[in-house]
Amino acid sequence: MCAALRRNLLLRSLWVVLAIGTAQVQAASPRWEPQIAVLCEAGQIYQPQYLSEEGRWVTDLSKKTTGPTCLRDKMDLLDYCKKAYPNRDITNIVESSHYQKIGGWCRQGALNAAKCKGSHRWIKPFRCLGPFQSDALLVPEGCLFDHIHNASRCWPFVRWNQTGAAACQERGMQMRSFAMLLPCGISVFSGVEFVCCPKHFKTDEIHVKKTDLPVMPAAQINSANDELVMNDEDDSNDSNYSKDANEDDLDDEDDLMGDDEEDDMVADEAATAGGSPNTGSSGDSNSGSLDDINAEYDSGEEGDNYEEDGAGSESEAEVEASWDQSGGAKVVSLKSDSSSPSSAPVAPAPEKAPVKSESVTSTPQLSASAAAFVAANSGNSGTGAGAPPSTAQPTSDPYFTHFDPHYEHQSYKVSQKRLEESHREKVTRVMKDWSDLEEKYQDMRLADPKAAQSFKQRMTARFQTSVQALEEEGNAEKHQLAAMHQQRVLAHINQRKREAMTCYTQALTEQPPNAHHVEKCLQKLLRALHKDRAHALAHYRHLLNSGGPGGLEAAASERPRTLERLIDIDRAVNQSMTMLKRYPELSAKIAQLMNDYILALRSKDDIPGSSLGMSEEAEAGILDKYRVEIERKVAEKERLRLAEKQRKEQRAAEREKLREEKLRLEAKKVDDMLKSQVAEQQSQPTQSSTQSQAQQQQQEKSLPGKELGPDAALVTAANPNLETTKSEKDLSDTEYGEATVSSTKVQTVLPTVDDDAVQRAVEDVAAAVAHQEAEPQVQHFMTHDLGHRESSFSLRREFAQHAHAAKEGRNVYFTLSFAGIALMAAVFVGVAVAKWRTSRSPHAQGFIEVDQNVTTHHPIVREEKIVPNMQINGYENPTYKYFEVKE
């Protein structure tokens, strides 16, 4: 009976084995269920397909999509599910766990679906779920059923797949099948249920054809041409319409609160980092776990920030397939988040199927921690002797798993700050590693310079690579964050438009029509359309402001799409007013009021009055006005930049000129100093020779005075003017002789020469010269001016002695000063020590030590000796305090 039951279980679980598309896990349910499939290929746009109740994939060309590109956004996928299955209550979607081969793809614009004969593709479809849908999992004999539920975790399909695989791996088992638990958002859930089986569980091996296709490749969503279907009442199954006037007023106040903050949102859009156009993978990083960052971030709906156009889907797991050299089996290393909830660690699971056809069994993928655990504790792994390589990656930011449209703006801002801090920490780690390598290089250079130089080259190359990788990673993360924010803002705007249109159409069809309800719903629709318009204009202005000529080029390429989007919004406004005109009574009451309301909304955009009209020319004029303003700002910035550059060059030239002038003055000063030194050196020999001549003359003049004796000296002293008279007489004789010689020379020129006169003149001159040389000269300060102006030898000796005495006096002064200061310091220190000791004594504190031996007649015990010391420190007997309190 047990064998029959086992066979029955194996037959019932055959559909599970057939769904092994990725060699990891099986699907949960083979029965028919609503599903849609989307094919996204570069350069090709295909219509999505849905699974009919007959089990065939069908393309319905009448069901329009929300954009010109393939469906990537979760909200768009959910909307298409609702369109494909209008009779079902579709509230959520989830990615299928296996691939299906689907053909008959129709390109966008095809007119007949029967003629579409596109080649078959392996696609992973999306399941359209109801309010709550739990899959039944088969539990074969020897396997275990378990589930993980954490209300604080709102994770996508892939993340819970990893969590279940890790939980099975901890038990030494492998995950056989799994299913999602309670949903907490669009395509995000708060738990997983799974079945774990032994690693060597016997099951039939099946050859499965697998193709490596991404589920949702990262790309920008061009939402510029979001189409508002005005007359399709099947777009949504909920309505904000209420027949209660109070509820309408509350909804209206909420929308007005959002619109009042719209200017702040648009202004903040320019200051927000738009990210880099790079959409490549962000590379490896080592940030902390998601468990460390688990806060709820709040922000109002009015804080929707209009960022740059283009949005990316949620962070998906990117896998790398590689061949294990030891065993030849294929292993997978993840470039995705790896986090562990409180119940179990997370192990990666594949998102892409391998390319080659091969016989596979259900072997779970291993994360870095799980692989290390298996390598250490189990030696018979199915993938070979060694653990598969895995790349450690940071956990995803909570922003990607927590979404509330009312708090989207604040969550985005907090996530931006968190991303900047994480990037700053990574840069700090890289710089620290660089410092360590630099120290190592300095040590190596002392031992082996050649090896050190080679090491430095490798080190520099690796550092440059690391810095570049960090920059690319940071740009990719910023772009991913901005793209997700853009996606959520656009989805929220579209949701508001759909809800407002549903409310408006229901209010118009109400019998009898309620003018107040129609007015409120139409105002809500007009505000939603205006918000979409403000978003388009803000994005266009952001492109203009994003980077000078490059931003202008990007805005020029985006202008046609922006203009078309504005025209579509104007067309929707006109259609809504046309719908109102079909009801003359309502139109007569509120038509003029609604027209004024439209103009009031348009006036909030800082648009000239001539451009408020809803026409293509007016919209083009608005875009041209923005472009002209930005071009004027760019030209002004360029002019200011050139002027600043010229000022800097002028200041640099002035500084250079001042520097040259300073150098010239310094050179001139040095030249003057050198010239003065040379002049002093040349004057020193002249002065010494002059002094020696003066000394010789003084000695010669002193000799005649000594020969005359004391009598002559007395005569000279008695008649001091005698020498002066003689010198004047000698000077007159000399002048007379010179005059005679000169007259004689003049007479020689005459034709007649008197020889006798010449002879007499010569004799007179010779006699005068002989008489002048024989007569001694008197020492006089006018005669020897140079000798009297120079210092004598005795004065120089006296100056040297005076300088030596002054130097000795200064030394004595310094010694006495130092001794006095030291003595004063010693006195102060002694006084301070004495005061400190005095203050520490009990007598100074008002206590008097009592001799216990004198006052008492009984011997003193040890405790009683301690009591006085305790009382000094403030001790009070508790017995006394007790009686005092009692009294």
Swiss-Prot record:
Residues 1-27 form the signal peptide. Residues 28-813 are extracellular. GO terms for molecular function: heparin binding; transition metal ion binding. Residues 141-199 are annotated as: CuBD subdomain. Residues 268-292, 329-352, 681-699 have a biased composition (Low complexity). SUPFAM superfamilies: A heparin-binding domain, Amyloid beta a4 protein copper binding domain (domain 2), CAPPD, an extracellular domain of amyloid beta A4 protein. GO terms for cellular component: axon; extracellular region; neuron projection; neuronal cell body; plasma membrane. Residues 30-199 form the E1 domain. Residues 395-597 form the E2 domain. Residues 246-267, 293-321 have a biased composition (Acidic residues). Disulfide bonds join 40-70, 81-128, 106-116, 143-197, 154-184, 168-196. It is found in: Membrane. Residues 30-133 are annotated as: GFLD subdomain. Residues 225-365, 377-396, 675-743 are annotated as: Disordered. The keyword rRNA processing does not apply. Disruption phenotype: Overexpression inhibits the Nedd8 conjugation pathway, disrupts the normal bristle pattern in the fly thorax, and induces apoptosis in wing imaginal disks. One of its GO terms (biological process) is neuron projection morphogenesis. Expressed in postmitotic neurons in the central and peripheral nervous systems. Within the nervous system, transcripts are not observed in neuroblasts, newly generated neurons and at least one class of presumed glial cells. Interacts (via the intracellular domain, ICD) with APP-BP1. During development, plays a role in the regulation of the neddylation pathway. Appl and APP-BP1 interact antagonistically during development. Belongs to the APP family. PANTHER family: ALZHEIMER'S DISEASE BETA-AMYLOID RELATED, AMYLOID-BETA-LIKE PROTEIN. This is Amyloid-beta-like protein. It comes from Drosophila melanogaster. The gene is Appl.
